[in-house]
């Protein structure tokens, strides 16, 4: 067992990991450190909540055999795209033909008049909407070579956006799952996330992609299509940096934002030209595919079952499935690195419905391990606890004796923390290491919210033989908690952010078998300590 590289910082998402958006991606370089520490080349590494495939990709890159399982079909699609080689020349050739044919067709949906040369066929690149009305148009003009001009949307521009002349080929009619936490109201559909013009452009593009003969290249182009969907939607917010003009605060020029978590459609939002979204995403995917061709061994075989994986020296097996019933023989896995759903933080299937519906993927809603606020689903704390315990039971079963499993987790919920820890310890694992795991990038919410979780914790456990089940309980001593908080802040005179304090107390208390309630920590901080400039300090509130 090697030492972790304590001073290594999380690297940003680039190359392979910048090809497609997915939530809760972990820093690939730090995941690689854990794989190198707790496994050896040739070992089988399992991630039964594999998401976008960081664990699987890094395991294969490091000479391990890998198993990636996820209940979300688009997650497995993304993972496969992060592993599969492609002929770059053929891919570029197919894209060039696609561009030659489809860009003019799609751009016809975005024709506007150039104010400089009066060309009626200038191309709209961006439209700013206020609620249901286009207000501002950004365009380029091939005739006078204007690269970017901005004008107020005319009635003709509004009609082009609201009543596209081309026929809608096919678009998903899928109804989104009602859930206020992810901004979905009852009766909302996937199609509500796009303008009518964008739906037409996307439908034309997808219809043409489906006609590509080479199946691998078709898959990459569909991957590019789903990767482009967020920026082609109405969920791209407008950034306006405020400044003073004539002594008054004025909203600045508009800048392009991005899709944040959930299906929030801002009152002021962008509509971006569909082809522009697709081509920009293709450039990212091309860079990622070049890297895959370089770092993923050509000898790594894509296997269709465990038996095949067990016979090869290098390979991977990825499949859509549930973590509660692994089709893996007992004691055959060398290391596990998993990032299970953190209670109610991220309803993955609900958030992926936009992608899955365009790809016509069906989802197994019943067996998802999650707590959801949706009134349409029976996904409460009890269901989460039972399924999580079953998933850890399967991890314990397939893991080799005295081998290790690392679990990434964090939550502001007391019950969710207790469910996670007791699912783990109750299975028979012994906790041997707890370390914070920084994120590669922080969201707007993480940067601004007082109680934002800015890291996760990696809890590494060892499979005990003989099996010894334990349980964790809550420590209810308020005086002891206040003393520990005071001691921590004495040693941090510059103050500390909420997540730093939570990390310190959880890391120190979990191995003792008794943890403080997260809610009690937060309440005690509010009652007994001062919060200033984003940090808690020792000075009393009086």
Please identify what each model-predicted range represents.
Residues 497-506:
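A short acidic, leucine-rich amphipathic alpha-helix
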Residues 471-474, 513-542:
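Charged low-complexity interaction tracts in eukaryotic proteins
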Residues 41, 361-362, 394, 399-405:
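Short glycine-dipeptide loop
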Residues 365-369, 403-410:
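Conserved beta-strand signature within the Rossmann-like core of class I S-adenosyl-L-methionine
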């Amino acid at each position: 067992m090697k030492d972790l590289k304590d001073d290594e910082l999380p690297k940003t998402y680039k190359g392979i990991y910048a090809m497609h958006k997915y939530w809760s991606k972990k820093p690939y370089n730090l995941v690689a450190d854990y794989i190198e520490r707790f496994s050896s080349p040739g070992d089988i590494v399992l991630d039964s909540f594999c998401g976008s495939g960081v664990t699987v990709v890094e395991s294969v890159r490091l000479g391990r055999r890998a198993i990636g399982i996820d209940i979300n079909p688009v997650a497995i699609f993304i993972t496969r795209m992060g592993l599969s080689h492609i002929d770059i020349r053929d891919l570029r050739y197919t894209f060039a033909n696609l561009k030659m044919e489809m860009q003019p067709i799609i751009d016809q949906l975005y024709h506007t008049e150039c104010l400089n040369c009066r060309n009626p066929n200038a191309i709209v690149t961006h439209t700013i909407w206020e609620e249901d009305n286009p207000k501002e148009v950004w365009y380029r003009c091939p005739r006078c070579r204007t690269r970017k001009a901005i004008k107020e949307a005319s009635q003709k521009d509004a009609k082009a956006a609201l009543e596209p002349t081309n026929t809608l080929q096919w678009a998903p009619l899928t109804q989104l799952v009602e859930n206020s936490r992810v901004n979905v109201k009852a009766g909302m559909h996937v199609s509500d996330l796009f303008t009518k013009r964008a739906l037409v452009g996307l439908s034309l593009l997808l219809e043409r992609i489906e006609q590509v003969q080479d199946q691998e290249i078709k898959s990459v182009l569909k991957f590019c299509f789903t990767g482009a969907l967020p920026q082609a939607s109405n969920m791209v917010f407008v950034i306006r940096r405020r400044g003073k003009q004539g002594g008054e605060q004025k909203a600045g020029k508009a800048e392009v934002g991005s899709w944040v978590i959930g299906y929030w459609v801002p009152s002021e939002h962008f509509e971006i030209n569909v082809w522009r979204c697709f081509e920009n995403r293709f450039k990212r995917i091309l860079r990622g595919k070049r890297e895959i061709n370089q770092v993923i061994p050509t000898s790594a075989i894509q296997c269709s079952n465990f038996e095949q994986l067990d016979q090869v020296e290098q390979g991977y097996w990825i499949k859509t499935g549930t973590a509660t019933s692994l089709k893996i023989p007992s004691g055959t896995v060398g290391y596990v690195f998993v990032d299970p759903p953190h209670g109610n933080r991220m309803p993955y299937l609900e958030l992926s419905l936009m992608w899955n519906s365009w790809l016509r993927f069906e989802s197994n809603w019943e067996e998802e391990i999650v707590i959801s606020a949706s009134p349409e689903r029976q996904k409460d704390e009890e269901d989460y606890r039972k399924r999580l315990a079953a998933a850890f039971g399967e991890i314990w079963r397939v893991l080799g004796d005295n081998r290790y499993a690392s679990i990434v987790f964090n939550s502001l919920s007391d019950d969710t923390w207790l469910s996670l820890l007791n699912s783990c310890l109750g299975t028979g694992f012994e906790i041997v290491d707890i370390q914070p795991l920084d994120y590669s990038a922080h969201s707007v919410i993480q940067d601004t919210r007082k109680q934002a979780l800015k890291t996760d914790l990696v809890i590494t456990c060892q499979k005990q033989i003989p099996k010894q089940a334990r349980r964790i309980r809550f420590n209810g001593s308020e005086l002891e908690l206040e003393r520990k908080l005071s001691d921590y802040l004495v040693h941090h005179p510059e103050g500390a952010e909420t997540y730093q304090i939570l990390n310190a107390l959880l890391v120190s208390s979990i191995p003792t078998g008794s943890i403080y309630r997260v809610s009690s920590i937060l309440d005690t901080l509010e009652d007994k300590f001062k919060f200033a400039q984003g940090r808690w300090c020792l000075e009393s509130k009086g």
